[in-house]
Amino acid sequence: MAQSSRYSNERVEKILAEMVQVLEKNQTPTDLSLMVLGNMVTNLLNTSVAPAQRQAMARSFADALQASVRDDPSH
């Protein structure tokens, strides 16, 4: 999801690679990977975001996800 961030690309890519490695190690099919990642997002929103901000944060995340899928013709 292309977006300006306070985190370096290097840090983001390192964490992403580690998460992909876990999914590959478990031979996780795409649908299960999406379920797990979706549950992780839900858990983060419910445990780390104030209740009044959760819906807006979820919408922002969903919008960014949809934009990144539309904007990436390489996949």
UniProtKB/Swiss-Prot annotation:
Pfam families listed in its UniProt record: DUF1414
Taxonomy, superkingdom: Bacteria
InterPro entries associated with the record: UPF0352, YejL_sf
Gene3D superfamilies linked to this entry: YejL-like (1.10.3390.10)
Signal peptide (UniProt feature, chain positions): none
Coiled-coil annotated residue ranges, if any: none
Membership in a protein family: Belongs to the UPF0352 family.
Protein name in UniProt: UPF0352 protein ETA_12580
Organism of origin: Erwinia tasmaniensis (strain DSM 17950 / CFBP 7177 / CIP 109463 / NCPPB 4357 / Et1/99)
